[in-house]
């Protein structure tokens, strides 16, 4: 049985193009998993195995890879850097124990770096930092570490220092051991020598060595006291303190190098072994009760406890349906029967595999700490708990963001409907942030996602991977509706048509709810005017209407309803009568309560060369942007701004034109806000026209 203390489940996180996939490739090369490193530059990387990833030079799916370094098992997940695929990062963090944050030596802390860092902090994931691409023009290790402090609010613990700059970057100095690692010009990772610190760096190395020791020993009161008395701690004692501080997120061991040029990578692997936690050293996952609340128990990581695992990713590849799981406790053998706690159904495990990106190794068994894929499971979705049927439990589920953009698609020929339906079913299972519905009036299939690139990739997969020839509509914004004032109202549903009739009268207050509260209901009825048995029917009636607003038919957000009185008939009143009354009350009262149209606001991060700042800001103002921040960088200016999603379609083309191709941007959903009257009127009119045309 494998020693859990020698397991490292880690993710690699970064902004687009910071070099995380190349970093993963070099890790695989050094650990002997591949013999020739691939590159995103030429579309040959091992973890970017989708056609869309190879062509665009970005990571879209989280690819799991297993490898070994110094008797330690690494399960590595290379995650996407583009904000449209943040859900992949989120669900990876859910099952990881540690991570490597990769930052570009010239780009520094970029927008998606902040998002990933925030998610990792929320998940309590310990990390080491790798400042990559120090061979690039404009790379500056210390500028990046300063940004880590200023922008991320994190404390970088500098473990290596660069030898040389830009094209003269030849190696690194290990600050703890005060040894220099110098690579030759062959570009091979193993072609390095360990030397004395260069003469012109001795003072600098000594300064950072002292700072490293001082910061580390603060994690151990006894060691700190002896250090203050002049006793120099051993390297092993310092490493133990660094490990504790890293696990507690007190600081982040920070390394430098060039993944592409194979410089500095061995020290990163050593850092994963020395400082990132094993599965038994992280806070255990909470267990949930039937209502979805924490029950006070935890999924302790141990091979001696009953089997518990979380399905964190579903993927359909050329080998068949794969369910990626993180095993938290117990053991799993081929042929075992396991319970899906969500569905209540059991399944037999036919085949288990260990993933090597696009390849696989068959497994006879797996244990706590492992990240594996089970082949051919049915009715399992992302976030489902798999467990021992004799010991049913539920792990904390995953919560995914709501899509903000949609497009209509339909096959060019009728024969493509079935093919498209099967393909979309598989894609929805793989990506919980990708949703699909059918327009009841037009019969069109509506694809919903997190951004233009997200849906662009999905359409591309439908066309090329599944061979569905599509007609694709224009992107549509996911508007919402809400109310702005509190009213008190009454509604009676009465129907008599021979025999027993229907009767339900409700008196209620309806008012704006808390932001992001959705729908809330309470009853303050005193006495028996509305019997308690009918209260759930009233709630159900109101809630069922939240999906279709009165202004333009968009879903309604944040409404609170209080039932305070009413009336009933001993014979004619029923649950269905009160449900119908609540539906009528909703239609009657929402217009009176100041119905308002809401639009999604995006948090936009724009980078532009300095000489184009005026044009870019002017354009953002015309797009109804609200400026949040503006900060100068080494090669340009970074602008943070909130902009309505409706104003951002096609923005990349405009930005490239304004900046001669040098501008970049990313955006993610921020919040919903009221539409200006002129915008609301146009949207409502367009929706009415669309419905009339159907």
Curated annotation (Swiss-Prot):
Stored CDD domains: EF-G, EFG_III, EFG_mtEFG1_IV, EFG_mtEFG_C, EFG_mtEFG_II
Recorded GO CC terms: cytoplasm
Keywords for the protein's UniProt record, in alphabetical order: Cytoplasm, Elongation factor, GTP-binding, Nucleotide-binding, Protein biosynthesis
Compartments, as annotated in UniProt: Cytoplasm
GO biological-process terms attached to the record: ribosome disassembly
Domain tr-type G: 5-280
Pfam families: EFG_C, EFG_III, EFG_IV, GTP_EFTU, GTP_EFTU_D2
Binding residues for GTP: 14-21, 78-82, 132-135
GO molecular function: GTP binding; GTPase activity; guanosine tetraphosphate binding; translation elongation factor activity
Xref: SUPFAM superfamilies: EF-G C-terminal domain-like (SSF54980), P-loop containing nucleoside triphosphate hydrolases (SSF52540), Ribosomal protein S5 domain 2-like (SSF54211), Translation proteins (SSF50447)
Family to which this protein belongs: Belongs to the TRAFAC class translation factor GTPase superfamily. Classic translation factor GTPase family. EF-G/EF-2 subfamily.
Function: Catalyzes the GTP-dependent ribosomal translocation step during translation elongation. During this step, the ribosome changes from the pre-translocational (PRE) to the post-translocational (POST) state as the newly formed A-site-bound peptidyl-tRNA and P-site-bound deacylated tRNA move to the P and E sites, respectively. Catalyzes the coordinated movement of the two tRNA molecules, the mRNA and conformational changes in the ribosome.
Record-given protein name: Elongation factor G 2
């Amino acid at each position: 049985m494998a020693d859990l203390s020698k397991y490292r489940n880690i993710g690699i996180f970064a902004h687009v193009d910071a070099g995380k996939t190349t970093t993963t490739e070099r890790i695989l090369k050094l650990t002997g998993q591949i013999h020739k490193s691939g590159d995103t530059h030429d579309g040959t990387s091992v973890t970017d195995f989708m056609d869309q990833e190879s062509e665009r030079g970005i990571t879209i799916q989280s690819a799991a890879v297993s490898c070994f370094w110094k008797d330690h098992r690494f399960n590595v997940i290379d995650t996407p850097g583009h904000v449209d695929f943040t859900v992949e990062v989120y669900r990876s963090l859910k099952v990881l124990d540690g991570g490597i944050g990769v930052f570009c030596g010239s780009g520094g802390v970029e927008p998606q770096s902040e998002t990933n860092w925030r998610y990792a902090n929320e998940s309590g994931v310990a990390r080491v930092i790798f400042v990559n691409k120090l061979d690039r023009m404009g790379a500056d290790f210390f500028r990046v570490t300063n940004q880590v402090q200023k922008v991320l609010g994190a404390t970088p613990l500098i473990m290596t220092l660069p030898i040389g700059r830009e094209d003269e970057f030849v190696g690194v100095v290990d600050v703890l051991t005060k040894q220099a690692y110098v690579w030759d010009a062959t570009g091979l990772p193993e072609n390095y020598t360990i030397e004395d610190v260069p003469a012109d760096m001795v003072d600098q190395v000594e300064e950072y060595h002292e700072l490293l020791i001082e910061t580390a020993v603060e994690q151990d009161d006894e060691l700190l006291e002896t250090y203050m008395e002049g006793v120099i701690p051993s390297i092993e004692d310092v490493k133990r303190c660094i490990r504790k501080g890293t696990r507690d997120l007190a600081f982040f061991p920070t390394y430098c190098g060039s993944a592409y040029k194979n410089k500095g990578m061995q020290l990163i692997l050593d850092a994963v072994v020395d400082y990132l936690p094993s599965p038994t050293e992280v806070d255990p996952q909470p267990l949930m009760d039937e209502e979805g609340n924490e029950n006070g128990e935890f999924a302790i990581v141990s091979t001696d406890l009953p089997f518990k695992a979380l399905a964190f990713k579903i993927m359909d590849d050329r080998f068949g349906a794969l369910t990626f799981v993180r095993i938290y406790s117990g053991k799993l053998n081929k042929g075992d029967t396991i319970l899906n706690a969500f569905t209540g159904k059991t399944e037999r495990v036919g085949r288990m595999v260990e993933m090597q990106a696009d390849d696989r190794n068959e497994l006879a068994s797996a244990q706590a700490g492992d990240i594996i894929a089970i082949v051919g499971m049915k009715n399992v979705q992302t976030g489902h708990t798999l467990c021992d049927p004799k010991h049913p439990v539920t792990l904390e589920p995953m919560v995914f963001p709501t899509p903000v953009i949609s497009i209509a698609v339909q096959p060019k020929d009728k024969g493509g409907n079935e093919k498209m339906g099967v393909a979309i079913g598989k894609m929805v299972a793989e990506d919980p942030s990708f949703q699909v519905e059918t327009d009841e009036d037009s019969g069109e299939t509506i694809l919903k996602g997190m951004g233009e690139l997200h849906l662009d990739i999905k359409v591309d997969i439908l066309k090329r991977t599944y061979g569905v020839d599509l007609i694709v509509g224009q992107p549509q914004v996911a508007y919402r509706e809400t109310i702005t004032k509190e009213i008190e109202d009454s509604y009676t549903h009465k129907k008599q048509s021979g025999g027993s009739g229907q009767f339900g009268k409700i008196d209620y207050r309806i008012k704006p709810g808390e932001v992001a509260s959705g729908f809330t209901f309470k009853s303050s009825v005193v006495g028996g005017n509305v019997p308690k048995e009918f209260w759930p029917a009233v709630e159900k009636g109101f809630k069922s209407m939240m999906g279709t607003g009165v202004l333009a038919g968009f879903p309604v957000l944040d409404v609170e309803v209080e039932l305070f009185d009413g009336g009933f008939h001993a014979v004619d009143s029923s649950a269905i009568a009160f449900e119908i009354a609540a539906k009528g009350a909703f239609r009657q009262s929402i217009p009176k309560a100041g119905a308002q149209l809401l639009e999604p606001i995006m948090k936009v991060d724009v980078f532009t060369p300095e000489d184009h700042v005026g044009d870019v800001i002017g354009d953002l103002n015309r797009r109804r942007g609200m400026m949040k921040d503006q900060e100068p960088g080494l090669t340009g200016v970074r602008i943070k701004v909130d902009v309505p999603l409706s104003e951002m379609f096609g923005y990349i083309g405009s930005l490239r034109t304004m900046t001669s191709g040098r501008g970049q941007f990313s955006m993610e959903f921020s919040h919903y806000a009221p539409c200006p009257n002129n915008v609301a009127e146009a949207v409502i009119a367009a929706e009415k026209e669309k419905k009339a045309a159907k």
